[in-house]
C-alpha cells in the first residue's frame, strides 16, 4: 500500500506547506484572484506550485525532520525520492537507518561514555573472531556452544537493552546461559578496551547517551522537532526506546507500518511497537493506507 510513499508525501507537505492542511483559517490578505487560482488548482488537480506561496503556513525546516527506517535499501530509496521531489532541500532532511543515525550521533558524543569519538565499528567477522577469543580465554568448549547461538543471545540481549549484569541474573542456574553470560561480559570488556563497538552497540550506547546525559537528548529532540519512522513493524525494543526518548516531550511523531508484514521477529522486531503505539502517544491518530500506490490498476 506504499508505506514509504506515505512518509515521503508527509515530509514533502510539511516542507512545502507547513500546517496549511490543518489550519482552518484563510491566509491573511488573500485577494480574490488568489482565491480563484486556488479554486482552479483544486478543481483541476494541477497548479500546486502556483498556489504554494498563498496557502503555505508555518513551513517546516527540512533539517528539523528526522526520517528513520529499517534497511539501507529503504533509507536510500527515501533519500532519492525526497531529492526528486524537494530538490536540494531534500538533502537537509536527516533520512537514514537507525544504526546510521546512532553512529552519526555517537561520532560526536561517544567520549561521554568513555569511548573516543573515533571508535571502530566491528563487522560480523570481527565479532566472530572476538567471541571465539573469549571462549578460548574462558576455556569453554566451543562444541557445546556454537558461535551462532552465542551471537544470537548477545544480540537479542542488546536489542532489549539488557546489559551483562541483567543477562547474568536471568540465567537461573542454566549452564549454557551462564556460559554465554561469561562470554557476553568478557566480549563487552574487550570491545571497550579496543575502543570498538559492534553493530548492536550503536543502538545501546545511543540509548545510554540519551538516558545518562539528558542535555544531549534534549539537544537532538529540539533539532528533530518532527520524527517519522518507516516500516515500524520491524523495529526492536532498543530502536523504539530511542524514538520515545527523542519525542517524549514534543510528541510530534509519525510512523507507518503493517502488522501483517512483521517478518523480523527472529532479529528482535517487536510488533507491540506498532500495536500499542496509540497507548504510548495519547491523542495519536490512526490512518489506514488503503490506496495502492504500486499498481496501475
Locations of regions flagged by a protein language model:
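Active-site catalytic microenvironments for nucleophilic, acid-base chemistry
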Residues: 13-21, 81-85, 108-109, 134-137, ...
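Short acidic/histidine-centered micro-motifs embedded in hydrophobic/aromatic stretches
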Residues: 101, 150-153, 157, 170, ...
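Coupling/switch/interface segments within P-loop NTPase motor domains and analogous charged loops
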Residues: 124-191
Amino acid at each position: 500500500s506504499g508505506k514509504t510513499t506515505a512518509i515521503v508525501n508527509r515530509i514533502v507537505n510539511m516542507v512545502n506547506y507547513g500546517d496549511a492542511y490543518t489550519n482552518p483559517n484563510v491566509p491573511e490578505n488573500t485577494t480574490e484572484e488568489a482565491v480563484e487560482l486556488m479554486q482552479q488548482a483544486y478543481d483541476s488537480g494541477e497548479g500546486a506550485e502556483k498556489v504554494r506561496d498563498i496557502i503555505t503556513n508555518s513551513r517546516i525546516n527540512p533539517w528539523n525532520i528526522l526520517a528513520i527506517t529499517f534497511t539501507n535499501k529503504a533509507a536510500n530509496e527515501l533519500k532519492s525520492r525526497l531529492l526528486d521531489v524537494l530538490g536540494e532541500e531534500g538533502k537537509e532532511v536527516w533520512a537514514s537507518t537507525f544504526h546510521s543515525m546512532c553512529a552519526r550521533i555517537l561520532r560526536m558524543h561517544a567520549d561521554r561514555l568513555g569511548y573516543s569519538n573515533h571508535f571502530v565499528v566491528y563487522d560480523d567477522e570481527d565479532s566472530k573472531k572476538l567471541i571465539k577469543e573469549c571462549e578460548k580465554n574462558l576455556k569453554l568448549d566451543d562444541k557445546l556452544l556454537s558461535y551462532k547461538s552465542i551471537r544470537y543471545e548477545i544480540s537479542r540481549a542488546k536489542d532489549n537493552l539488557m546489559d551483562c549484569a541483567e543477562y547474568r541474573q536471568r540465567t537461573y542456574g542454566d549452564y549454557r546461559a551462564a556460559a554465554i553470560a561469561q562470554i557476553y561480559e568478557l566480549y563487552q570488556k574487550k570491545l571497550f578496551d579496543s575502543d570498538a563497538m559492534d553493530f548492536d552497540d550503536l543502538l545501546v550506547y545511543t540509548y545510554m547517551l540519551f538516558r545518562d546525559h539528558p542535555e544531549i537528548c534534549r539537544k537532538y529532540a529540539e533539532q528533530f522537532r518532527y520524527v517519522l519512522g518507516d516500516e515500524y513493524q520491524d523495529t526492536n525494543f532498543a530502536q523504539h526506546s530511542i524514538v520515545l526518548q527523542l519525542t517524549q516531550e514534543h510528541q510530534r511523531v509519525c510512523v507507518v507500518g503493517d502488522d501483517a508484514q512483521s517478518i523480523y521477529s527472529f532479529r528482535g522486531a517487536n510488533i507491540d511497537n506498532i500495536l500499542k503505539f496509540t497507548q504510548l502517544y495519547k491523542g495519536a491518530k490512526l490512518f489506514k493506507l488503503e490506496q495502492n500506490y504500486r499498481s496501475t490498476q
